[in-house]
Amino acid sequence: DGIVRGAYKIEELGDGSDKIRLLGSGPILRNVREAALELHRDYGISSEIWSVTSYGELRRKGLEHERSMRLNPEISEEPYVSRCFGDQIPTVATSDYISSVPEMIQRWIGGRYIVLGTDGFGRSDTREALRSFFEIDTNSIVVAAISALEQEGTLPPGTVEKELRNRNLNRERMDKTA
């Protein structure tokens, strides 16, 4: 049912109170799962891992629901996208499309929402190198999740800085969209 509706939960990793939701699709799901494993191993962070089959369908149904509610105010149920992502769990959406694709559902996300996408100029390289350049690789997903949790106060200040050093990532490098 979720496949057709636009998103479905693949798995939950861990059962702790510190939790992140990770969204991905297609080949990026491998990186999302790796990030979830690393977050659990290194920080004890639990993850919901979701496959998004269509941000467009989630948006269409969300907009359709909003229209229905305008015309029928007695409707009280939430749209599917809100039932999936409307709580306060911080969410990181990773896409090998431009970030405006996952941003289509931002209005229905309840908590902090970080989007990683391939904005910028076209390039030619290996898949691994391109994912690293566009910051949609496993390292970038882990850092985005840690950043969301640090901003929420779940992780102590300085956790992102430590993780950037551990992963040898340079925050001063050129912005991919520049």
Show where each model-derived region lies.
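Thiamine diphosphate
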Residues: 1-178
